[in-house]
Regions:
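Dinucleotide-binding Rossmann-like beta1-alpha1 core, especially the glycine-rich loop
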Residues: 1-35
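A conserved FAD-binding loop/helix module that cradles the flavin
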Residues: 193-207
Length: 207
């Protein structure tokens, strides 16, 4: 099956962030500050952010603070599922992958009562991202994601010799609960906390 004239593109978060930061650093009116945010307070004329022991005031604050461990669905009317995943970028000793043919939903992995699948994004005949993904209300112990990946690579891809070049993991809320666009007169939520996760796929930027 061909996607023509469409194409599937993989956008690495780190590449996007570097591009955005390089652009912003070139602007004379932008200053970067890296510090833990201690509080965000709303006001009628301005909002205040306290970070690293200092308080900063602005007419508008764009809030992207989101911690999946603290996100809870308390209203029974809404779904409380999560999309959670671990992926490995692997390199093989022989040609294995077709760079023109990604695998999007491979359900040849034990389901254990919830939807689980693996997708493969090949970069070259010997390099690919192999990602184990599932939808459930509860997360797995970290070792279980690794075990599922090892089993899939061995049993389905028939690979025993490969190198793990990079790893990634994440948790994305998959809920129909409305996300407030504002948390005050002067505070606007963006990113995941602003409800900007694509509902059909879970694709999103955390911040």
């Amino acid at each position: 099956y061909t996607l023509a004239p469409f194409r599937y593109h993989m956008l690495r978060g780190i590449d996007f962030y570097r591009h955005a930061q390089d652009t912003l650093r070139s602007l004379p009116n932008v200053t970067f500050l890296q510090a833990p945010v201690e509080s965000v307070q709303d006001g009628s004329q301005h909002a205040q952010v306290t970070a690293g022991g200092q308080t900063y005031a602005a007419e508008w604050v764009f809030n992207s603070l989101f911690r999946s461990s603290e996100f809870k669905i308390t209203d029974p009317r809404y779904q409380d599922d999560k999309q959670h995943f671990t992926g490995w970028e692997i390199e093989t000793e022989t040609d294995v992958f077709n760079p023109q043919c990604p695998t999007m939903f491979d359900f040849r992995t034990p389901q254990h009562g919830v939807m689980r699948f693996v997708y493969i994004l090949p970069f070259s005949p010997r390099q690919a991202l192999v990602e184990y993904t599932l939808f459930s209300a509860d997360l797995l112990p970290p070792a279980e994601y690794d075990l599922a990946l090892k089993s899939y690579i061995q049993d389905v891809l028939k690979l025993t010799h490969y190198r793990i070049q990079a790893e990634e993991s994440g948790v994305i809320p998959m809920t129909d609960q409305p996300f407030p666009r504002r948390t005050g007169q002067r505070i606007l939520n963006i990113g995941t906390i602003g409800g900007r996760v694509k509902p059909s796929t879970g694709y999103a930027f955390l911040r």
